[in-house]
A protein has these predicted regions:
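Fe-S-dependent hydro-lyases/dehydratases of central metabolism
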Residues: 1-415
């Protein structure tokens, strides 16, 4: 019998033939720790009795949730992180370069077929290049830092096939939101999602990142895309035989297969306050809004900003509506600036902020108060995430979000 992509990655890593449900120990290729968890990881690492990192070059520390500090306690996280990095010889430290999940792929830390762990649930993002990237807690991370290994249970795989050409006003965000709605918030718990089909093949790596990023919102352990020439170009590598083999075999055993026609997708939103509460944008039209946020590790990439700029070009943000745009990384910020994208956004009335997690995690300027309503491109709309527990958060694509900013209410984008 053939293998799924996740089975091939684990088999290559461990040297063992594996099947779903097997518990194995994997060798870790890279880890990521962000500023929220570094104090706890560091304390637990030393509490466990470790005196050195298994491989300092394979450890990446990224400050993104708390930069620049907006609360006094935030600086403690930076001090603890810097102390830990200096003490244990870590060189891969990013203090103001952008969001962890953007930087891990953008800076070349993750390659196709790698096994990567991160202290964040959206570590699943790296599946966009064909890596296996589970999110873990700080205790597990401390153990990896000392040993370079971690146990996992081999997940079952749900195959998602998408064929055809997407409508012009639909983005990959609409695809993953629809899938989450169909599966439910726990419909893929501890399972791998494996994406294929002509629509997927034609996607940019950035679009695949959006889908992989939000896979956890259906409970998935990972979302995997077969490495191709786009992947190789993005990662600035030539794919080796192992990486080229990372596609599901025809006779592989899948838990189930879900098939979509690309032409059937329409702009959708996740309604307050559940990510799997999906509605067509058309049935929500006319709902007044107070703010729009375009950014995050889900939709803060160059193509996202460009899509928003195309909608906003020559237009103005509606009166009494605030538009906040946060690029996912410094590199994206500079690219968007050179291309005139930031000018277009600013001329339309957008407030453009420094790269980072920003409003998505409610730690930067732009939080909302009771009764306010925001359309946002991030990945979660839980109660209290972007302000008080009485804020309504609607999740949407950058095109939809930009169109709503101009209209001052929920609308369906035309292009």
């Amino acid at each position: 019998m053939g293998n799924t992509v996740i089975e091939k990655i684990i088999r290559h890593n461990t040297g063992k033939d594996v099947k779903p449900g097997d518990i194995v120990t994997v060798n870790v290729d890279r880890v990521m720790i962000h500023d929220i968890f570094i104090p706890f990881v560091g304390d637990k690492f030393e509490e466990m009795g470790f005196t050195k990192l298994w491989d300092p070059d394979k450890v990446v520390l990224i400050y993104d949730h708390l930069v620049p500090a907006s609360q006094v306690d935030d600086t403690r996280h930076f001090h603890k992180g810097d102390e830990f990095a200096k003490k244990y010889g870590m060189k891969n430290v990013h203090r103001s370069d952008g969001i962890c999940h953007q930087l891990m792929t953008e800076a070349g830390y993750v390659k196709p077929g790698d096994v990567v762990f991160g202290t964040d649930s959206h570590t699943t993002t790296y599946g966009c290049v064909g890596a296996f990237p589970p999110g873990i807690g700080y205790t597990e991370m401390a153990s990896i830092l000392g040993t370079g290994t971690m146990w996992i249970k081999v997940p079952e795989t749900i195959k998602v096939v998408i064929e055809g050409e997407l409508p012009k006003n639909v983005m990959s965000k609409d695809i993953i939101l629809r899938l989450i709605g169909d599966l439910g918030a726990d419909g893929a718990t501890y399972r791998a999602l494996e994406f294929s089909g002509s629509t997927v093949e034609n996607m940019t790596v950035a679009s695949r990142m959006t889908i992989a990023n939000m896979a956890i919102e259906a409970g998935a352990k990972c979302a995997l895309f077969t490495p191709d020439e786009k992947t190789a170009e993005y990662c600035e590598i030539e794919l080796n035989d192992y990486q080229k083999s990372l596609k599901g075999d025809e006779d592989a055993k899948y838990l189930r297969t879900i098939t979509y026609r690309a032409e059937d997708f329409v702009p959708v939103m996740a309604c307050p306050s559940q990510v799997d509460k999906i509605r067509d944008t058309s049935v929500l039209e006319g709902t007044p809004i107070d703010q729009v946020f375009i950014g995050s590790c889900t939709n803060g990439r160059l193509e996202d900003l460009q899509a928003a700029a195309e909608v906003l070009k020559g237009k103005k943000v509606a009166d009494y509506v605030k538009l906040i745009v946060t690029p996912a990384s410094r590199k994206i910020y500079l690219q968007a600036s050179k291309m005139g994208i930031l000018d277009t956004l600013a001329e339309a009335g957008a407030m453009i902020t420094h790269p980072g997690c920003g409003l998505c995690c409610g730690r930067a300027g732009g939080i909302l108060s009771d009764g306010e309503r925001v359309v946002a491109t991030n990945n979660r709309n839980f109660l209290g995430r972007m302000g008080t527990s009485k804020v309504e958060i609607y999740l949407a694509s950058p095109k939809t979000a930009a169109a709503c900013a101009v209209a001052g209410k929920i609308v369906t984008p035309e292009v």
